[in-house]
């Protein structure tokens, strides 16, 4: 089974690309959805967060106040690392549980949708990494429009993560999401076909041509039938 790591940064459009990948039949494991489930009231992760950050991160209805928690961790790298130490091990365990479930089902490929893929070391556990990229100004404008943050708050949240340009330099494939949905979809379809052994797709990192290709039918390829063990596994997880 082939494992593709999908990442980006806040307001880059990774969720849009993740949804597009489901269309040609990819099994997508959404790390954000796992985090939300693990942080429900009464779970061990929820209780650990409240112990670490105090009752101020709990809403009157007893649920986690993610905005309040976000204000704390995006302003203080030490507090962010404390949160990651609580959340990441539980998320990692659940992701691998789902990967093994898809493997037992005979799925030929799975996409790990992980926002902090590089930061948490998932790039060493997958066959290839795709990064959803936009320029810094587009990212900031989209974040402000989406969340209502001030320009200063938006800049702080963006700065708290590895830059998209750095992620793009490390990536195997880049999805340029500055343009229309149709242009993004064409790149996703082409990259999916290339990952499955066909033609097309965005060039690997380091290439000078990071522009969308024409729409490509996902077509036949290794992703349409049971595949070999992931390259990352055959290399012992070392990229």
From Swiss-Prot:
Residues 204-230 have a biased composition (Low complexity). ATP binds at residues 11-16. Pathway: Cofactor biosynthesis; coenzyme A biosynthesis; CoA from (R)-pantothenate: step 5/5. It catalyses: 3'-dephospho-CoA + ATP = ADP + CoA + H(+). GO terms for biological process: coenzyme A biosynthetic process. Its main location: cytoplasm. The keyword Transferase applies. GO terms for molecular function: ATP binding; dephospho-CoA kinase activity. It comes from the Bacteria. Keywords: ATP-binding, Coenzyme A biosynthesis, Cytoplasm, Kinase, Nucleotide-binding, Transferase. One of its GO terms (cellular component) is cytoplasm. Residues 197-239 are annotated as: Disordered. Gene3D superfamilies: P-loop containing nucleotide triphosphate hydrolases. The keyword Kinase applies. It is found in: Cytoplasm. Its EC number is 2.7.1.24. Residues 3-206 form the DPCK domain. Transmembrane segments: none annotated. NCBIfam families: dephospho-CoA kinase. Belongs to the CoaE family. Catalyzes the phosphorylation of the 3'-hydroxyl group of dephosphocoenzyme A to form coenzyme A. This is Dephospho-CoA kinase. The lineage of its organism: Bacteria, Bacillati, Bacillota, Clostridia, Eubacteriales. The gene is coaE.
């Amino acid at each position: 089974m082939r494992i593709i790591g999908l990442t980006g940064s806040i307001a880059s459009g990774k969720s849009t690309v993740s949804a597009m990948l489901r269309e040609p039949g990819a099994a997508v494991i959404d790390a954000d959805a796992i985090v939300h489930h693990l942080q429900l009231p009464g779970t061990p992760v929820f209780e650990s967060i409240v112990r670490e950050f105090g009752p101020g991160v709990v809403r009157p209805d007893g649920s986690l106040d993610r905005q309040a928690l976000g204000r704390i961790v995006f302003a203080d790298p030490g507090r962010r690392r404390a949160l990651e130490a609580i959340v990441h091990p539980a998320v990692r365990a659940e992701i691998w549980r789902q990967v093994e479930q898809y493997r037992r089902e005979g799925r030929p490929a799975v996409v790990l949708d992980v926002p902090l893929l590089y930061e948490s070391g998932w790039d060493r556990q997958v066959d290839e990494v795709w990064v959803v990229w936009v320029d810094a100004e587009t990212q900031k404008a989209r974040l402000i429009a989406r969340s209502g943050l001030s320009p200063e708050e938006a800049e702080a949240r963006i700065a708290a993560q590895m830059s998209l340009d750095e992620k793009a330099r490390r990536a195997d494939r880049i999805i340029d999401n500055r343009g229309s949905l149709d242009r993004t979809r064409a790149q996703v379809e082409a990259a999916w076909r290339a990952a499955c052994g066909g033609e097309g797709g965005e060039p690997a990192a380091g290439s000078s041509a990071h522009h969308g290709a024409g729409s490509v039918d996902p077509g036949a390829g290794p992703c349409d039938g049971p595949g070999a063990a992931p390259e990352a596994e055959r290399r012992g997880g070392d990229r």
